[in-house]
Curated annotation (Swiss-Prot):
UniProtKB keywords: ATP-binding, Chaperone, Cytoplasm, Nucleotide-binding, Stress response
General function of this protein: ATPase subunit of a proteasome-like degradation complex; this subunit has chaperone activity. The binding of ATP and its subsequent hydrolysis by HslU are essential for unfolding of protein substrates subsequently hydrolyzed by HslV. HslU recognizes the N-terminal part of its protein substrates and unfolds these before they are guided to HslV for hydrolysis.
Cellular compartments annotated: Cytoplasm
Species for this entry: Dichelobacter nodosus (strain VCS1703A)
Full protein name: ATP-dependent protease ATPase subunit HslU
Length: 451
């Protein structure tokens, strides 16, 4: 069944999941273990026979830690690893039902949209070779119209010209040749419905209604063969996939494998020392409760049960405490993990160890201009020390501080890169970092505004 639906039956042990997360995220061992156990529990649940399987619910997680330490990245990487529908929302964007603002049910609708897109891409990937072949035939029909069937065999004659053009197109020798092709264009393609905040569902319903009224018509367009192949392959793939199967698979994938990450949950916790009514706090928690407990939400694709969706809530909890959340919601977030603030050593590892570390990214970017950046060990240590120092003396924004520092560090290089000689080498050592960032980092007032 799962193979038919297209999503992965992830049979990785928690240890293997943590090792995979270690390739992208530094530290936060406890948080990684918690999400790895949650993902493995999903696999275990699938091995249990019904009716007990449907009674086993996911153990939702509450992550507590300052901004920029990896809370969102852990959840995002986990979803990517499982190839599961994933959505990140901010609790502060939602208000209690009856007030102006987004309704919490839209979280599940957005999750289903993500799942539909995921399943559609998978379905198109499965028919990719057929679609490309059909697109190639349509391009060849423009260049060399098909010959009629022979009277004796009823088969098409093999046209040498058609065969020659096919080989040239496959060798990409005709990519820039301009041809005129017929493409599909829906009558409602350019209709966009604008609705007030909180009424996105009405917008999608109206769009669907106009789409059903609109009919597809053929339009002739001139484009290069390279672009024509892409456009026509997309059309052919759209025709080859079964939209009913995609919808069914997407709903099942969202229900069984969906991951919802609710950020800034602490901002809707009602602090005990603050009185008065607060629409965006306790009311939002009470509206979130049915989703987390398990309920059925109506979407344009059908009814979605949230019983087995994994919810990961996170917050810094600087002013509020986890105990300030309503007791019912606390009970639905049984796994608590506290993430550590980043040290100077963590910053150093973040700069160098991940598969797509910042240093690798910037080195690759400048290499496109034939400018070779070399970060020395003392230079990396200095950047890490400054990041830690600025976070400590101003606002702690975690690893995001490194983006600001390196952007500042490479600002003049980025501006002048195109004017430099090819093959230039720039060594970024401790002296270079001190010269560029030292004065700003030591001046607290400047740090607040610039770094």
């Amino acid at each position: 069944m799962e193979k038919l639906l297209g999503y992965r039956d992830l049979n990785m042990t928690p240890r293997e999941i943590v090792e995979e997360l270690d390739r992208h995220i530094i530290g936060q061992k406890h948080a990684k273990r918690a999400v790895a156990n949650a993902l493995r529990s999903r696999w275990r649940r699938k091995q249990v026979a019904e009716p007990l399987r449907s009674e086993i619910t996911p153990k939702n997680i509450l992550m507590i830690g300052p901004t920029g330490v990896g809370k969102t990245e852990i959840a995002r990487r986990l979803a990517k690893l499982a190839e599961a529908p994933f959505i990140k929302v901010e609790a502060t964007k939602f208000t209690e039902v009856g007030y102006v603002g987004r309704d919490v049910d839209s979280i599940i609708r957005d999750l289903v949209e993500t799942s539909i897109k995921l399943e559609k891409n998978r379905a198109k990937e499965r028919v990719k070779s057929k679609a490309r072949e059909a697109a190639l035939e349509r391009v060849l029909d423009v260049l060399v119209p098909r010959k009629k069937q022979t009277a004796w065999t009823g088969e098409e004659e093999i046209d040498p010209a058609r065969k020659m053009y096919r080989e040239r197109i496959l060798r990409e020798e005709m990519n820039d040749t301009v041809i005129e092709i017929e493409t599909n264009q829906s009558m409602s393609a350019n209709v966009e419905i604008m609705t007030p905040p909180g009424m996105e569902e009405m917008s999608s319903q109206l769009s669907e209604m106009f789409k059903s009224f609109g009919r597809e018509k053929k339009t002739k367009r001139k484009m290069t063969i390279a672009k024509a192949l892409i456009q026509l392959a997309e059309e052919e793939a759209e025709a080859l996939v079964s939209h009913e199967e995609i919808k069914s698979a997407a709903i099942d994938n969202a229900e069984q494998n969906g991951i919802v990450f609710i950020d800034e949950i602490d901002k809707v916790a009602r602090r005990s020392d603050v009185g008065g009514a607060d629409v965006s706090r306790e009311g939002v928690q009470r509206d979130l409760l049915p989703l987390v407990e398990g309920c059925t939400i109506s979407t344009k694709y059908g009814m979605i049960k949230t019983d087995h969706i994994l919810f990961i809530a996170s917050g810094a909890f600087h002013l509020a405490k986890p105990s300030d959340l309503i007791p019912e919601l606390q009970g639905r977030l049984p796994v608590r993990v506290e993430l550590d603030a980043l040290t100077a050593d963590d910053f150093k590892r973040i700069l160098t160890e991940p598969d797509a570390s910042l240093i690798k990214q910037y080195t690759a970017l400048f290499a496109t201009e034939q400018l070779h950046l070399e970060f020395t060990e003392d230079g990396i240590n200095k950047i890490a020390e400054i990041a830690y120092h600025v976070n400590k003396t101003t606002e702690n924004i975690g690893a995001r501080r490194l983006h600001t520092l390196i952007e500042r560090l490479t600002d003049s290089l980025s501006f002048d890169a195109a004017d430099r000689r090819d093959g230039d080498r720039v060594i970024i050592d401790a002296a270079y970092v001190e010269k560029t960032l030292g004065e700003i980092s030591n001046n607290e007032d400047l740090s607040r505004f610039i770094l």
